């Protein structure tokens, strides 16, 4: 008769289920909640008796946890037991499978240093003999030796059905100090007899490097290079910058560089672009990755590869004929002899089932598929594709036309030093801001405007609108001049100036002239006198 436990969580899942101990083994099946058809179709998790290597009991997230180390299926964690279940489980495991249930207490000191133990299925970090935390190898997607004494662990977030409950740990770094001395195995017995030569034949190796190599072997991180379907050697990447060997497997891709290695699943590749570079020497390939690759705090949502335009590759797939006929006949070719970027594009298209985007109908003034421009302080090229803008190479920007509210053209035609260039401002929908590409040659303006209008993208030319507003304003001003300017000019000449001059003379005379109080008749008589006296009078006043 079996023993059942309800409300048990498998491998920290968000859905509980039923755990059962039977004569032939044990199993877990999720409980169907809310009539969910997806839950009802879930297959049970089964473990036979001969798969059990060891079983441990410890505190868990939802009560007490049963951790099962298997021989071939990694670590199985079952959480949600009560403290009273320990005796029943211990007796059942002993009676049915002859397996001892070991009680493990965790260290709760909170110290960030201790010792590591690489066991069959997991990495255990311990303090004073008590485990602080455990990391199953199945959760580690990649590891890198980031410095002489530091090892980085990257965790796998790409599993099928992965559904995080909230914030997730994506990377951990371990500081591993110290060195270990290794003897040179190629040394001869005569050299070993000599003490000085023996010292020379000993090599120092950091403990971090030894830990890194052992972890890679234990966790089986990355497939063996010889198992790759196809490989490309020494490919130059502009993002992340460096040269990498590309090993393409059935479901994943591994980039092996001098310092770092990256692993991505085929399903992470959202888009593939194959674009000629404007220098007519190189060809670019861009992979859009979601979620992006990570290196510390840096994320890489786009991988940019650069090839010589005429570089060719002759390669054969590393698969058996029957496997090729069964899996790859309709997707790949058995043998390739073509340009390198064409071969890689075809292979990625076949394995990821993703369309390769190439330049569309747009041609610049110089018959190229891109225009030179700058984004902030970075110079690059803007590719007007059939459905989007793309800026290369750094940073890589992709703006679909469906996200564009309007395109504003400014600085075109101004009588300044910048009159030979214009700016292209791409305004996004839903008030998501704008992106400006500056210093585009004015020769490209008309061609670019026509292309965008053909794609039903709203284009606004600020210079044309400004000129139209100015002409409208000047037109209204000229009409006002025909009505009012004549009388205004006449008033200025016949009234205002004479009155102003006359009043000024009177004021000066009253203030400085001793004869300023003469009668009006005397003034008229003086006006009829010789005009030569008036300049001398003004000179006297001055």
From Swiss-Prot:
Any single Gene Ontology cellular-component annotation: FACT complex
Similarity section: Belongs to the SSRP1 family.
Record bears the keyword Transmembrane helix: no
Compartments, record wording: Nucleus; Chromosome
InterPro entries in UniProt: PH-like_dom_sf, RTT106/SPT16-like_middle_dom, RTT106/SSRP1_HistChap/FACT, SSRP1-like_PH1, SSRP1/POB3, SSRP1/POB3_N, SSRP1_DD, SSRP1_sf
Gene3D superfamilies, A to Z: 2.30.29.150, Pleckstrin-homology domain (PH domain)/Phosphotyrosine-binding domain (PTB), Structure-specific recognition protein (SSRP1)
Region (Disordered): 458-542
Keywords associated with the record: Chromosome, DNA damage, DNA repair, DNA replication, Nucleus, Transcription, Transcription regulation
Note: In contrast to the orthologous protein in animals and plants, this protein does not contain a HMG box DNA-binding domain. This function may instead be provided by the HMG box of the associated NHP6 protein in the FACT complex of fungi.
Function: Component of the FACT complex, a general chromatin factor that acts to reorganize nucleosomes. The FACT complex is involved in multiple processes that require DNA as a template such as mRNA elongation, DNA replication and DNA repair. During transcription elongation the FACT complex acts as a histone chaperone that both destabilizes and restores nucleosomal structure.
Main location: nucleus
GO biological process, one term: DNA repair
Gene, per the UniProt record: POB3
Name this protein carries in UniProt: FACT complex subunit POB3
Annotated Pfam families: PH1_SSRP1-like, POB3_N, Rttp106-like_middle, SSrecog
Protein origin, superkingdom: Eukaryota
Organism, as annotated: Eremothecium gossypii (strain ATCC 10895 / CBS 109.51 / FGSC 9923 / NRRL Y-1056) (Yeast)
Subunit (UniProt): Forms a stable heterodimer with SPT16. The SPT16-POB3 dimer weakly associates with multiple molecules of NHP6 to form the FACT complex.
SMART domains reported in the protein's UniProt record: Rtt106
Lineage, highest ranks first: Eukaryota, Fungi, Dikarya, Ascomycota, Saccharomycotina
GO molecular function, one term: DNA binding
Acidic residues biased stretches: 477-514, 521-530
């Amino acid at each position: 008769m079996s023993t059942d436990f309800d409300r048990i969580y498998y491998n920290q899942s968000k859905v509980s289920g039923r755990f059962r101990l039977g004569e032939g083994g044990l199993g877990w099946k999720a409980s169907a909640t809310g009539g969910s058809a997806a839950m009802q179709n879930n297959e049970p998790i089964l473990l036979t008796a001969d798969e059990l290597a060891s079983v441990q009991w410890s505190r868990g997230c939802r009560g007490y946890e049963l951790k099962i180390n298997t021989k071939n299926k990694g670590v199985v964690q079952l959480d949600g037991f009560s403290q009273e279940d320990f005796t029943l489980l211990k007796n059942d495991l002993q009676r049915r499978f002859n397996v001892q249930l070991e009680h493990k207490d965790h260290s709760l000191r909170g110290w960030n240093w201790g010792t590591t133990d690489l066991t069959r299925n997991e990495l255990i970090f311990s303090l004073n003999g008590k485990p602080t935390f455990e990391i199953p190898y199945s959760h580690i997607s990649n590891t890198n030796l980031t410095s002489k004494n530091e090892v980085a662990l990257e965790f796998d977030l790409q599993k099928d059905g992965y559904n995080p409950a909230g914030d997730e740990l994506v990377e951990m770094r371990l500081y591993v100090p110290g060195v270990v001395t290794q003897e040179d195995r190629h040394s001869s017995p005569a050299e070993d007899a000599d003490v000085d030569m023996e010292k020379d034949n000993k090599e120092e190796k950091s403990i971090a490097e030894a830990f890194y190599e052992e972890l890679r072997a234990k966790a089986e991180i990355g497939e063996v290079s010889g198992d790759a379907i196809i490989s490309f050697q020494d490919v130059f990447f502009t993002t992340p910058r460096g040269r990498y060997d590309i090993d393409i497997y059935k479901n994943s891709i591994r980039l092996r560089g001098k310092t770092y290695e990256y692993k991505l699943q085929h399903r992470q590749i959202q888009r593939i672009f194959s674009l000629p570079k404007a220098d007519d020497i190189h060809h670019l390939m861009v992979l859009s990755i979601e979620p992006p690759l990570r290196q510390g705090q840096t994320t890489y949502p786009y991988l940019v590869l650069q090839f010589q335009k005429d570089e060719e590759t002759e390669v054969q797939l590393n698969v058996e004929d029957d496997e090729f006929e069964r899996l790859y006949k309709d997707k790949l070719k058995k043998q390739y002899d073509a340009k390198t970027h064409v071969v890689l594009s075809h292979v990625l298209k076949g394995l990821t089932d993703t369309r390769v985007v190439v330049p569309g109908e747009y041609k610049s003034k110089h018959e190229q598929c891109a225009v030179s421009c700058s984004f902030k302080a970075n110079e690059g090229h803007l590719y007007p594709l059939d459905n989007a803008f793309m800026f290369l190479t750094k940073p890589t920007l992709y703006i679909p036309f469906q996200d564009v509210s309007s395109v504003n053209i400014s600085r075109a035609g101004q009588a300044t030093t910048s009159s030979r260039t214009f700016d292209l401002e791409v305004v996004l929908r839903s008030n998501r801001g704008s992106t400006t590409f500056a210093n585009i040659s004015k020769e490209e303006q008309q061609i670019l405007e026509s292309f965008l209008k053909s794609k039903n993208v709203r284009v606004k030319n600020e210079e044309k609108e400004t000129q139209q507003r100015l002409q409208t304003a000047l037109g209204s001003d000229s009409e006002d001049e025909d009505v009012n300017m004549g009388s205004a000019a006449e008033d200025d000449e016949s009234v205002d100036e004479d009155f102003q001059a006359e009043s000024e003379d009177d004021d000066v005379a009253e203030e400085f002239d001793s004869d300023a109080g003469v009668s009006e008749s005397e003034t008229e008589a003086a006006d009829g006198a010789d005009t030569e006296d008036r300049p001398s009078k003004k000179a006297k006043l001055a």
